[in-house]
């Protein structure tokens, strides 16, 4: 899924050296810890100690273990204590976003302040009365707003990944792999600690290798303080604008509004936003089939175990379920030249989306399949953070060749051979 980038140097809102008061108070309020997970206790202990460093630390704060004098040395002691606390509670915090954010934040901060992993640790000082004139505590972002939490912790915007499935189905994975699949039945597009998405496919016609998505099931898993578990299910000719329980949000919890469902075009386009995990999903219906598109935070997409490794968005279609180029080039209900002309109108670049469109229109005989490929490309244009990856050109997914194209290429090869032997 790609390597996690290092956070840039963190600064306070006023540009002063990183005292971390703002960041640590953020961690204190990361409220979706599991009932057994003790990450909130670790956060509180760390906050308690680092608050004493806001003014640069006391004169007798130990040096060593970090650069920048006493305050930095004290900070390293606090970070080592924080890291030790997270290790002790790691077993019960699997899949908890507050825990994983804390672990990665500790690692980044120890690198920034040149803290050694071995060395003295600190115990949080006793809390004293509030100092007069200290002013209100810094504002903290909504614990159910993933992007705001991440930005405050890491000093940068989070990374996002994009996956889509449409048409035959064709799958664009998080790794920008593009496959045409023959999968039938129910297959998981996503299966991680926060989200489960399953697509059910059936043949476009009796005896055909090509299949289309007829049903999509999405489960937003329970997250304490943010949402109740919610299930969304769409089928061909039944694209509801609500979850299965009739609701349009995450429930009555404080962060219930961080999950919402909206419809741009009733019966054909539904958008689900899950701000608490930095995720947006679009489900569409075109030409008697469903399509799926997602933009998801990297940390969320990575939060799965070895037992959850079969995910089309992660690994693409299994090799045994991928249609070869020769299979994609077989004559369908519409001539390839005609399909190419129809697809070219909305997809001028002959990339993987264009190739998929030609295949779908040719096999199904339905020109409306052009809309599915065009919509998938439009979603990618919005969801991708790097538009250099918008157009994909898979090695084994070249556009179906028309007889005229084949003839031109053959003549070109013959001309080169003739020229070489002269």
From Swiss-Prot:
Residue positions of GPI-anchor amidated aspartate lipidation?
A: 396
Q: Where is this site: Cleavage?
A: 168-169
Q: How is it modified after translation?
A: Autocatalytically cleaved at low pH; the two chains remain linked via two disulfide bonds. Also proteolytically processed by TMPRSS6, several fragments being released in the extracellular space; regulates HJV activity in BMP signaling and thefore iron homeostasis.
Q: Where is the composition biased (Low complexity)?
A: 128-137
Instruction: Please give the positions of the paired cysteines in each disulfide bond.
Output: 144-226, 163-313
Signal peptide annotation: 1-35
Provide a Gene Ontology MF annotation, just one: transferrin receptor binding
Q: Where is this region: Disordered?
A: 116-138
Q: Which UniProt keywords apply?
A: Autocatalytic cleavage, Cell membrane, Disulfide bond, Glycoprotein, GPI-anchor, Lipoprotein, Membrane, Phosphoprotein, Signal
Query: Which residues of the precursor form the propeptide?
Result: 397-422
Glycan-modified residues: 114, 209, 368
What processes does the entry annotate via GO biological process terms? activin receptor signaling pathway; BMP signaling pathway; cellular response to BMP stimulus; intracellular iron ion homeostasis; multicellular organismal-level iron ion homeostasis; negative regulation of BMP signaling pathway; negative regulation of transcription by RNA polymerase II; positive regulation of transcription by RNA polymerase II
Q: What is its main location?
A: membrane
How this chain sits in the membrane, per its record, is:
Lipid-anchor; GPI-anchor
Q: Where in the cell is it found?
A: Cell membrane
Phosphotyrosine occurs at 46
Keyword Phosphoprotein assigned: yes
Q: Which GO terms describe its cellular component?
A: basolateral plasma membrane; BMP receptor complex; cell surface; extracellular space; HFE-transferrin receptor complex; plasma membrane; plasma membrane protein complex; side of membrane
Assembly and interaction partners = Interacts with BMP2 and BMP4. Interacts with BMP6. Interacts with BMPR1B. Interacts with TMPRSS6.
Q: What does this protein do?
A: Acts as a bone morphogenetic protein (BMP) coreceptor. Through enhancement of BMP signaling regulates hepcidin (HAMP) expression and regulates iron homeostasis.
Q: Which family does it belong to?
A: Belongs to the repulsive guidance molecule (RGM) family.
Which named protein is this?
Hemojuvelin
Species of origin reads: Rattus norvegicus (Rat)
Q: What is the lineage of its organism?
A: Eukaryota, Metazoa, Chordata, Craniata, Vertebrata
